[in-house]
């Protein structure tokens, strides 16, 4: 059941990200500008996808048990990489706060958008 859960998490995040990128691309090509709404939607989709990828990697890492800790195991490198990416500015929890402020009509003064 964990592999099925991981697959569902990944596929839904991947579809969400690709849908948002396509929609923003189309709107930007039509208008010639990437609006704040578009930038917010891209940030949200990107951050969400990072955290879902981290959750998927954690599931697989746990399933591999102690084999996961060895450098010759590919999952170890992927585990390390996704945890680093989640700490990058694109993956930080503050993104959700910024998006929430935007959706509530509150000012967003951030270089992260």
Where are these regions (language model features)?
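Extended amphipathic alpha-helical segments enriched in small hydrophobics
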Residues: 1-26
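Catalytic cores of transferase enzymes with a strong primary signal for eukaryotic protein kinases
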Residues: 4, 18, 35, 62, ...
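Generic structural signal for well-ordered, non-transmembrane alpha-helical segments
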Residues: 4-11, 43, 47-54, 80-83, ...
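Charge-rich, acidic-biased intrinsically disordered regions
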Residues: 26-43, 68-84
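Charged, glycine-rich active-site and insertion segments that engage polyanionic ligands
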Residues: 37-68
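Glycine-rich phosphate/cofactor-binding loops in nucleotide/flavin-utilizing enzymes
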Residues: 66-113
């Amino acid at each position: 059941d964990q592999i099925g859960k991981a697959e569902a998490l990944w596929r839904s995040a991947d579809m969400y990200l690709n849908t948002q990128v396509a929609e923003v691309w189309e709107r930007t090509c039509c208008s010639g500008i990437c609006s704040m709404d578009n930038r917010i939607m891209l940030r949200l989709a990107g951050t969400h996808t990072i955290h879902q990828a981290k959750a998927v990697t954690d599931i697989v890492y746990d399933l591999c048990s102690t084999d996961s800790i060895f450098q010759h195991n590919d999952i170890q490198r992927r585990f390390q990489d996704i945890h680093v990416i989640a700490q990058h500015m694109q993956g930080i929890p503050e993104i959700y706060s910024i998006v929430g402020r935007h959706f509530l009509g509150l000012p967003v003064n951030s270089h992260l958008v």
